[in-house]
Amino acid sequence: MKQILFICPRNPFSERYSGDVIRAKKFIYSLSQNNYVKVISLDSKDSQKKESRLSYESFKEINFFIKIFYIIFSLIKIKPLQLGYFFSPKIKEYVQNNYQNYDIIFFQSFRTAQYMPEDNKKKCILDMGDLMSENYKQTSSRYFFFNPIRVVYYIESLLVKKYENFCFDKFTKILLLSKKEMSRVEKKYKNKLAQISFGINNINKIYRFHQKN
C-alpha cells in the first residue's frame, strides 16, 4: 500500500459544485481503494476528516490583504497571479516538513504546484486538467481591445504558459483531460503526459504509470 499526499487548492469534500472539486474527490476515493491518501487544502477554517484509508486536513485561508501582497509578489517574480491568490505558508511548511513520509505527491491544479518541496526526489503527479493558458488567452480575446480586463487575462495567459512549461519540466507525470489538450503540448514533454478523462472508471489508469515509472 502506497502512501500518497494529495494537495488541493480547495476543499474536495465541501460539496461545492465545481469541476475541480468534483474531479479531486473522485481521484481521492479511487486512489484510496488501494492506497492510503492524506489530503490537504485551503478552506474557510481549519478542519479534519478521517476515514479508513484517507484523512483530510484543511488550513484556514489567509486574509484578503495578505493575499494582495502575495499576488503582487507573484507578479514581481513573473509568475501567475493565481499562485499568490491560492498561496498558503502553512501548506508550504506542511509539505516541506512531511513529504518524505509519502511515496507519491499528487498535486491537483497548477495552483498547487508551487508547493513542490525543495530538492524533491519523490514521484510527483500534477492533475493539470486543461491548459489554462489557452483558456485565458481565449477569454481575453472576447473583450474589447481597450478593456483592462482583456489586458489582465492576456498577461495572465502568458504567465500561466510560462509556468505550465515549468511544471512539464519538474513533474513525473502530467494529467490532462483530452487528446486535444495533449496535442498542444511541446513534443519533448509527450512522454510525461497521460490522459485521464472525467469518468471515475478511467481514473484507475493512474495505477499503471505508478507501476511503470
PLM region spans:
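Membrane-proximal helix-turn-helix segments that form the acceptor-binding/catalytic region
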Residues: 26-27, 89-96, 132, 149-174
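A conserved catalytic-core segment of Leloir-type glycosyltransferases
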Residues: 42-93
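Acceptor-binding helix/loop patch of EC 2.4 sugar-transfer enzymes
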Residues: 64-82, 124-162
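Short N-terminal targeting/anchoring amphipathic segment
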Residues: 95-113, 122-125
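Short beta-strand scaffold positions
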Residues: 107, 176-177
